[in-house]
């Protein structure tokens, strides 16, 4: 699948460019059944040589319609949430000081869990990202707690962007 090549290319780009700090970030689609294994393997591979820093962005998933066709995603949101939160815990326990993580989430529980883990593990290398116009209350709360927050704006032609934006609205209807 194309995801295999994207994973390998992203890992190689981190090896090449993240020598002094994390410049290149790899996105982990945590709704995929193989995502946690890929994440842990990347940590193990890096720890064996310790010659570059990890840039990691955890998302629940972005290509639902395409990935569903290949039977590679969890069947329920509960399973996806569990896998995502397991990833949050793993990176907060196993990271090096210069590793950098972005948690792209509108999920209050995942954010609260990460804040707890940041404090417990005394790390400061986790930032947050949310879609512009969604979860502004969570973003504001994070900023008030001196956390780094990124707002992103998807772009593209309407035909390609509409399914993504519609799904984001549907998934996050309760928080609007």
Protein language model regions, located:
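Positively charged, amphipathic and often flexible ligand-engagement surfaces
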Residues: 1-176
